[in-house]
Amino acid sequence: WDVQGYYGNPTSKLWLKSEGEAALGEGVEDAEVQALWSKAVAPYWDLQVGVRQDLAGETDTHAVVGIQGLAPYLFEIDAALFLSQRGDLTARIEAEVDQRITQKLILQPRVEVSLAAQDNPARKVGAGIDKIEAGLRLRYEIVPEFAPYIGIEQGWKLGDSARYTRLAGDDPSVTSVVIGVRFWF
């Protein structure tokens, strides 16, 4: 899942974000929730600060500083730095763009890159580029506020992260099918 919502005005907002992964027939593999205060710093760009709580595995708490906005050519960007209570520094950047096939059918390529400043074998994270995920989602906007989608995502663990994953008996390359609904009100 990947859920985002906010309350506020165009220049100052409280964002709540949550994302996680679970395989059919298995428990939750990875999950987090974030509470962020967001302040407009430029047209189409917000600076965000707040807290992130991991909900699966090691339940670390992180301070968050990030930026979210709309880059040229309508790329939606969400980039954040995370500092855990253990002193682990990580970062994540996500980018996506809507490509209209018809007025109602939209193809959305997306990419996410995760980085870590130091090794954390307990979380299967190596220093450097930890993980890259790339995917395509095809959605049909029944109305602009409601659009079911289906997609495919490919994720790769890299470097020491891939080594830690293999040592745990898991595959560092994972292909996933995603199904969901995008809605707003």
Task: List each model region and its residues.
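Outer-membrane beta-barrel initiation region
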Residues: 1-26, 35-39
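Residue-level signature of outer-membrane beta-barrel architecture
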Residues: 7-9, 39, 53, 69, ...
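Membrane-embedded beta-strands of outer-membrane beta-barrel proteins
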Residues: 3, 35, 65, 93-95, ...
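Transmembrane beta-barrel strands of outer-membrane/channel proteins
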Residues: 16-20, 49-53, 79-83, 109-115, ...
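Detector for outer-membrane/organellar transmembrane beta-barrel domains
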Residues: 60-120
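Outer-membrane beta-barrel "beta-signal"
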Residues: 135-141, 171-185
